Amino acid sequence: MNRNNPNEYEIIDAPYCGCPSDDDVRYPLASDPNAAFQNMNYKEYLQTYDGDYTGSLINPNLSINPRDVLQTGINIVGRILGFLGVPFAGQLVTFYTFLLNQLWPTNDNAVWEAFMAQIEELIDQKISAQVVRNALDDLTGLHDYYEEYLAALEEWLERPNGARANLVTQRFENLHTAFVTRMPSFGTGPGSQRDAVALLTVYAQAANLHLLLLKDAEIYGARWGLQQGQINLYFNAQQERTRIYTNHCVETYNRGLEDVRGTNTESWLNYHRFRREMTLMAMDLVALFPFYNVRQYPNGANPQLTREIYTDPIVYNPPANQGICRRWGNNPYNTFSELENAFIRPPHLFERLNRLTISRNRYTAPTTNSFLDYWSGHTLQSQHANNPTTYETSYGQITSNTRLFNTTNGARAIDSRARNFGNLYANLYGVSSLNIFPTGVMSEITNAANTCRQDLTTTEELPLENNNFNLLSHVTFLRFNTTQGGPLATLGFVPTYVWTREDVDFTNTITADRITQLPWVKASEIGGGTTVVKGPGFTGGDILRRTDGGAVGTIRANVNAPLTQQYRIRLRYASTTSFVVNLFVNNSAAGFTLPSTMAQNGSLTYESFNTLEVTHTIRFSQSDTTLRLNIFPSISGQEVYVDKLEIVPINPTREAEEDLEDAKKAVASLFTRTRDGLQVNVTDYQVDQAANLVSCLSDEQYGHDKKMLLEAVRAAKRLSRERNLLQDPDFNEINSTEENGWKASNGVTISEGGPFFKGRALQLASARENYPTYIYQKVDASTLKPYTRYKLDGFVQSSQDLEIDLIHHHKVHLVKNVPDNLVSDTYSDGSCSGINRCEEQHQVDVQLDAEDHPKDCCEAAQTHEFSSYIHTGDLNASVDQGIWVVLQVRTTDGYATLGNLELVEVGPLSGESLEREQRDNAKWNEEVGRKRAETDRIYQDAKQAINHLFVDYQDQQLSPEVGMADIIDAQNLIASISDVYSDAVLQIPGINYEMYTELSNRLQQASYLYTSRNVVQNGDFNSGLDSWNATTDTAVQQDGNMHFLVLSHWDAQVSQQFRVQPNCKYVLRVTAKKVGNGDGYVTIQDGAHHRETLTFNACDYDVNGTHVNDNSYITKELVFYPKTEHMWVEVSETEGTFYIDSIEFIETQE
């Protein structure tokens, strides 16, 4: 087929390459479709799946008007609207050919240059010459790449084979890459940003071509040989580019409006023209971008552009004054805001005009007999969509001299005559005659036919599209009367025509063969408290808004399909809060919950809106039907915006086929080409969701397919478990005795049987003050490979302040704040299995498909699926270098529900990544070596100190001379060891954990022996005054690890009674210090009144007449042979302050 020959029709060859024959299509059950599967295993079955083979091309006559860029923009939008009404694959090549011939009619960039010149004139700003050259060069390149792609696509469609598929895939990727690299030249790159407004049309048209291209991967990718993962990447790129392109166009359009805003009539005219022409050239196109989503609109849709277009006011306004006749644009008496308020209506429901009644009045010029009958006012009769009720609106001065125009069948163009009538004393701006096509004529009545006049036609500003583009929907009016410069009076009666697209379905017809769009601005009525607000620029029209519960509005529709047909409902909306809605279809209601989509007081951007499909099905009971939307309960102070309803027809047979196709795609995309392993980018969550899709297949229709797919997906699950380096991924045992299993705090629970996880899920409660909620696990180094990338995958249902850490010789930190926006309206299917996962899976998939996957880490923190990567180094055998997986919530209002956790090997590092890791690893090893040397020194000192505590090598007997001070000295040495924990709060071991643990255990043994041999209970005061009898003016204080008794008054006293072995040798050892005057006493006494006292005073710090530091503790001891079993120890002082670190009374050998 020749793309450039509009009279040539395409002939499709008979099907081949495994496609079904005509007999198979006509008699689908004539032979057993399962026979071929009887002796297959799942790998052989999956190899038979190559995707969808669908394609039929239509070549309509092409219409090109390269001289009028406004006409070009209108033609493109009109053709796209028609294209979107049918399944995408049907006419792609001819459709692309039309677009390229519109934009490059003569293989040069004349149309694109005209796009730029058009806006340059409107905003009175020239684009930089270098920017123009760069843009035109890039456009030429894009055109050439597109031509090459279309040639390859057409050749492949005519006779597909592997070589042609490879060629078209290569050219597709080349064209996609070309768009990505060249789009910055059209207003977003650093060199062109200053000219973004003047480049807006170029940007929008180029973005449109790019988005149309990306959808081809979804239509043809499987047939080209792309893996499902690759197709998903292109799909995600399409969704992300739709967001980027839409937001740029809206922001640039609004900035352009602000740039041309002024204060007078001339500035308002420029503002008005910019608004109109950019709507036709760019913003209408932007509103169609979402409809290129093949997954959401596989069989076409009927997008509706409900926005209004205002042509220029009908007033005498030639390029220059003519004699005494003055052009209206130069007048100083109409302000910008006055004109905007008079000519531009507030947002309102969509309407059609039934009747226009024009009133006429006669104006006679002062001092003469010259007169003119002019349009002084009018009355409009209109009605809302599919609503029989009519209402009237009047403007200007209503008189008995009227001319009636019946516009029920539409008014598509108007020729008008504007006059500036009068003389030096007074003049009038008015309209004297008009011709409404095809409705009728209002003839001119005047006796001064040769006075200043200007004939205006709406088709100059609003070109027709195949004579079927626009309908007159309203007429606004400006009436003014002013006296300026003495007796000169100026009167003005100025109408402005308002237009809507004729292809907007005024009867809201619902069909069974495509998705029906029902914009809420086409409601027949709205509830009290609902307001119509200006659309955000990308919805194609205005939208509805509510700030409290109640009725949103009612849409009246006509069902042009069998009443047995079932449908699903989608609602496109934006909201600052989660809320519940009821959709009433006639008298039956369906309720569902909608999550919030935007922050309070946030602006309405593309990503603020969400399209949610409700799993409940509906059926219309009559052809004339109503759909009423209610919000409850109260949402006071919040904002809800509703854009449109989508009515999605259900074809059971087709949906069953699509379900099988989706299941095949999902399962096939899990495996590598050989079907022996999982693809690296496949997650455990995706395996579970593929299993759900397979489980939902019909046993009757696809029994053998289902059996094979179940076998395959079970194999995938086994492979997923085998590659998962985490132990116990199902959380069967937490805090078990296994060394490397899950360790968790309080507040971690396991849930099972929920709607969002096929397996078990983790729930982390909020932290308690300084105690985080956590769960962690160590992956042993023996299971890891050096210089390899590993990935932690998971799925978060919802979370706030969830911290996910991967710790190796460095830490990778991720915070997830995932909104609770996965709405589940699922219910039990009546079986013992509980949840209806078929319905649940469909709904969750729709929501996840709509979820952005941005590269920005702040935005990525909100996605439900997550991946976190970490690299291993050389796995130094001298250091335990496993990978710690840590999940924790450290805030008191945080929480998390997540599951499908897996740590998998991605592959060996190479190139720059390997070099960077080797450099980082070398630095880390060097730092570890330095720390190890310092730690070894401390370790040896601490080990020697602990050795001195014992008299044997088995640490079973404490040296008699050892006191608490010796134990504390050793403890301080151990405490100075660094890098004991990677995370001190969770006590995750660090590189020095083992030696620290070794020394700490020995010290603990020494402390135990010390406590055991001391017959004085709590002699180190670590338990305060437990076991002691004390007066109220005594206390135990703490300094670091030391606890000490403090007596600060002469009458303070502390004592204790204990038992001993009579007539054995004991040593009383006291470590204390005396501060100030007086003495401190520690006295020991038995039941025979035999007593000994250790005295502490200032003289203790005089050594050979030299005073030493009196802040140090001194140890004194004495030997005592008790005569009785009962003993007493007493502590007192005479004045000053007495500090006692420890009191020991220990039995010793003779």
Curated annotation (Swiss-Prot):
SUPFAM superfamilies: delta-Endotoxin (insectocide), middle domain, delta-Endotoxin (insectocide), N-terminal domain, Galactose-binding domain-like. CDD domains: delta_endotoxin_C (cd04085). The keyword Electron transport does not apply. Keywords: Sporulation, Toxin, Virulence. One of its GO terms (biological process) is sporulation resulting in formation of a cellular spore. One of its GO terms (molecular function) is signaling receptor binding. Promotes colloidosmotic lysis by binding to the midgut epithelial cells of insects. Belongs to the delta endotoxin family. Toxic segment of the protein is located in the N-terminus. This is Pesticidal crystal protein Cry9Ea.
